């Protein structure tokens, strides 16, 4: 017969009493009413907050943007194929945030900051909210440092400063992404962290951009956030905010950052899809009423913070695609009004072989010469006006048969100026090389060459200066001024090289 030992029983009871936990856990739950098209309608979830993350029974995460009288509209961050009607949903009490750290440099991630490049997990101990407030007026200062793109047309006539928002706008296939990627390539050695956000693009296009960065050593200082065309609309809508959160992390650590959103038209389309499925009332072009706020709260996060917040900066280059050059459509006008200027790429110029196809006449930088070094101001001050006058004269000259000598000379000069602005893709130029190029054109040294010889001569001249006259580059980089000494060195080099070049061409 089994003997019952009273002290053993009392010990067990005592242990159980000690382990008893009186904590009451209140979980805010709901039930799925319907699910489909990346949207779920939930009954219950009475205490849920706007924008709160919710978790479904099978693990899918969603965001609750629509709080209605008898149900909650949730957008899914995934396909949601395993979610069933009647399954339970619980509120998490958190809003969307991502891990951030230096370890993200050189990686390709998705909108949830998960790596998609097959190179393992990314370790991070710090988190940032995907949507964080933009710096206020007092915590900003005006833009004063240049951010060199390496493209002569931009750095000389439409300069971009650190902390500026400059829109790149144009039709499809006009080289918008090329301008943005060249700018990233030109940041090598400039201590600038770059974030490239690809929204709704073909996976092959993103892979091509990443390959270019890897070949040119740009991935060392770049993070690529990619949500391709087959991603759910929710993730395409979130991707730019994820990129901004990563760039802000570096900005507040006193680093300079550059972020490219490629492109915001596709983000607006993804947001429109979400809003219409949530049955929000449509407005102009069927976009919801808050599509302006969608972009303004994103682009206002780019800033040049005041010295109290450190000497970091976040420069944004949003890209917007137009339909047959129509900049008066809804999204283009919205983003133009938010940004500090725009670079307009023209399909006509692109097809005429002028690449980058920047229409200098209607492109503008609202920061202006504050974002240029003194040497560039000295050399390129009049070039925008000269090109505008040339374009006007060229249009007029089509109808005139006999032109006087002065007009012919002005047309010849304009054609050569336009020629020197042409650049091959992925070949950005340093500031000193740009100064050499512009000075040679604006001072008439190219007038004696044929148009077809201009680019060949300029390559030869820049190579000669780099190898034989390194002091020119030293003067520009140390003083940032186009001094008399620098001008003397340059004049001498141009005259030497032009004579040599003409001799070579004759033989």
Curated annotation (Swiss-Prot):
Amino acids binding ATP: 170-177
Reaction equation(s) it catalyzes: ATP + H2O + 4 H(+)(in) = ADP + phosphate + 5 H(+)(out)
Annotated SUPFAM superfamilies: C-terminal domain of alpha and beta subunits of F1 ATP synthase, N-terminal domain of alpha and beta subunits of F1 ATP synthase, P-loop containing nucleoside triphosphate hydrolases
Organism: Nuphar advena
GO-annotated cellular components: chloroplast thylakoid membrane; proton-transporting ATP synthase complex
Name of the protein described by the UniProt record: ATP synthase subunit alpha, chloroplastic
Family the UniProt entry places it in: Belongs to the ATPase alpha/beta chains family.
Subunit and partners: F-type ATPases have 2 components, CF(1) - the catalytic core - and CF(0) - the membrane proton channel. CF(1) has five subunits: alpha(3), beta(3), gamma(1), delta(1), epsilon(1). CF(0) has four main subunits: a, b, b' and c.
Annotated signal peptide: none
Highest taxon above the source species: Eukaryota
Gene3D superfamilies: 2.40.30.20, ATP synthase alpha/beta chain, C-terminal domain, P-loop containing nucleotide triphosphate hydrolases
Cysteine pairs bridged by disulfides in the record: none
Membrane association type: Peripheral membrane protein
Enzyme Commission code: 7.1.2.2
InterPro entries tied to this protein: ATP_synth_asu-like_sf (IPR023366), ATP_synth_asu_C (IPR000793), ATP_synth_asu_C_sf (IPR038376), ATP_synth_F1_a_nt-bd_dom (IPR033732), ATP_synth_F1_asu (IPR005294), ATPase_a/bsu_AS (IPR020003), ATPase_F1/V1/A1_a/bsu_N (IPR004100), ATPase_F1/V1/A1_a/bsu_N_sf (IPR036121)
GO molecular-function term, one example from the UniProt record: proton-transporting ATP synthase activity, rotational mechanism
Keywords per UniProt: ATP synthesis, ATP-binding, CF(1), Chloroplast, Hydrogen ion transport, Ion transport, Membrane, Nucleotide-binding, Plastid, Thylakoid, Translocase, Transport
Residues the UniProt record annotates as site (Required for activity): 363
Role description: Produces ATP from ADP in the presence of a proton gradient across the membrane. The alpha chain is a regulatory subunit.
Compartments where found: Plastid, Chloroplast thylakoid membrane
Enzyme class, UniProt record, top EC level: translocase
């Amino acid at each position: 017969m089994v003997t019952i030992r009273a002290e053993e029983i009392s010990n067990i009871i005592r242990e159980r009493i000690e382990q008893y936990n009186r904590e009451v856990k209140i979980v805010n739950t709901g039930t799925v009413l319907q699910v489909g098209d990346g949207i779920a309608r939930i009954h219950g979830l009475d205490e849920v907050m706007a924008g709160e993350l919710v978790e479904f029974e099978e693990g899918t995460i969603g965001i609750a943007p629509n709080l209605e009288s008898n149900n909650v509209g949730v957008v899914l961050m995934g396909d949601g194929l395993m979610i069933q009607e009647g399954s339970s949903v619980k509120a998490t009490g958190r809003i969307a945030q991502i891990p951030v750290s230096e370890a993200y440099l050189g990686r390709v991630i998705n909108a949830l900051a998960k790596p998609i490049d097959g190179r393992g997990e990314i370790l991070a101990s710090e988190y940032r909210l995907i949507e964080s407030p933009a710096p206020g007026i007092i915590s900003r200062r005006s833009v004063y440092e240049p951010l060199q793109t390496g493209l002569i047309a931009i750095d000389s006539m439409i300069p971009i400063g650190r902390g500026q928002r400059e829109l790149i706008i144009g039709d499809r296939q006009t080289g918008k992404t090329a301008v943005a990627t060249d700018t990233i390539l030109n940041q090598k050695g400039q201590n600038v962290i770059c974030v490239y956000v690809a929204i709704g693009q073909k996976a092959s296009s993103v892979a091509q951009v990443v390959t270019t960065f890897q070949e040119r050593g740009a991935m060392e200082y770049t993070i690529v956030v990619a949500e391709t065309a087959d991603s759910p609309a929710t993730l395409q809508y979130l991707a730019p905010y994820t990129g901004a959160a990563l760039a802000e992390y570096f900005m507040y650590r006193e680093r300079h950052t550059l972020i490219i959103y490629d492109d915001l038209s596709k983000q607006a389309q993804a947001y429109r899809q979400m809003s219409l499925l949530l049955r929000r009332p449509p407005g102009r072009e069927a976009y919801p009423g808050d599509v302006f706020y969608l972009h303004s709260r994103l682009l206002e996060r780019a800033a040049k913070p005041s010295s109290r917040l450190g000497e970091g900066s976040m420069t944004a280059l949003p890209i917007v695609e137009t339909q047959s050059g129509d900049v008066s459509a809804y999204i283009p006008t919205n983003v133009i009004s938010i940004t500090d200027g725009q670079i307009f790429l023209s399909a006509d110029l692109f097809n005429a072989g002028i690449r980058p196809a920047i229409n200098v006449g209607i492109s503008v930088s609202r920061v202006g010469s504050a974002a240029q070094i003194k040497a560039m101001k000295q050399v390129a001050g009049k070039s925008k006006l000269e090109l505008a006058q040339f374009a006007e004269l060229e249009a007029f000259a089509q109808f005139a048969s006999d032109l006087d000598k002065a007009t012919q000379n002005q047309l010849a000069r304009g054609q050569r100026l336009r020629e020197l602005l042409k650049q091959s893709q992925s070949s950005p130029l340093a500031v000193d090389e740009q100064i050499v190029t512009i000075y040679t054109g604006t001072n008439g040294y190219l007038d004696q060459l044929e148009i077809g010889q201009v680019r060949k001569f300029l390559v030869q001249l820049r190579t000669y200066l780099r190898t034989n006259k390194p002091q020119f580059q030293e003067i520009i980089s140390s003083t940032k001024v186009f001094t008399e000494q620098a001008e003397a060195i340059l004049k001498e080099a141009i005259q030497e090289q032009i004579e040599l070049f003409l001799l070579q061409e004759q033989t």
